[in-house]
Swiss-Prot record:
Family of this protein: Belongs to the pancreatic ribonuclease family.
Enzyme Commission (EC) number: 4.6.1.18
Expression (tissue specificity): Seminal plasma. Can reach 3% of the protein content of this fluid.
Official protein name in the record: Seminal ribonuclease
PANTHER family per UniProt: RIBONUCLEASE, RIBONUCLEASE PANCREATIC
Record's GO cellular component terms: extracellular region
Cited CDD domains: RNase_A_canonical
Function: This enzyme hydrolyzes both single- and double-stranded RNA.
Assembly, per entry: Homodimer; disulfide-linked.
Residue positions, PTM Deamidated asparagine: N93
UniProt cross-references to SUPFAM superfamilies, sorted A to Z: RNase A-like
Binding-site residues for substrate, renumbered to this chain: K33, R36, K67, P68, V69, N70, T71, K92, R111
Length: 150
């Protein structure tokens, strides 16, 4: 009986720990989500009008619904992370953790077209060079949200 409780108690503790930790195991961090949704460093902006249709799909922004607007940044991750130590500005939602890039960056804006309807999401692709504004968080401070381009 004593041996049985010696085995059961540690197993119970292990199960409780796994149940508590499990929900966070598959959860994407805000920084990882920012990179998935907004970074396209390895590529110069494509001149293809189909760029947004392909990227929005392969970056999982058309699952369950069409994300109406998204911006891809075509600069190095290091350059985008550096924005978190540049000009501090107020975010669109009033928070104070946004930063504006010192220099313009190559970006592609993707906007859902009027004919777009889930599951056939359709986007207009527009390439521009603008300053980006990102919300930063964590230690070290890294981009966690794309706020705007100006």
């Amino acid at each position: 009986m004593a041996l049985k409780s010696l085995v059961v108690l540690p197993l119970l503790v292990l199960v409780l720990l796994l149940v508590r930790v499990q929900p966070s195991l598959g959860k994407e961090s805000a920084a990882a989500k920012f990179e998935r949704q907004h970074m396209d460093s390895g590529n110069s902006p494509s001149s293809s009008s189909n760029y947004c249709n392909l990227m929005m799909c392969c970056r999982k922004m058309t699952q369950g619904k069409c994300k109406p607007v998204n911006t891809f940044v075509h600069e190095s991750l290091a350059d985008v992370k550096a924005v978190c130590s540049q000009k501090k500005v107020t975010c669109k939602n009033g928070q104070t953790n946004c930063y504006q890039s010192k220099s313009t960056m190559r970006i592609t804006d993707c906007r859902e077209t009027g004919s777009s309807k889930y599951p056939n999401c359709a986007y207009k692709t527009t390439q521009v060079e603008k300053h980006i504004i990102v919300a930063c968080g964590g230690k070290p401070s890294v981009p966690v949200h794309f706020d705007a381009s100006v």
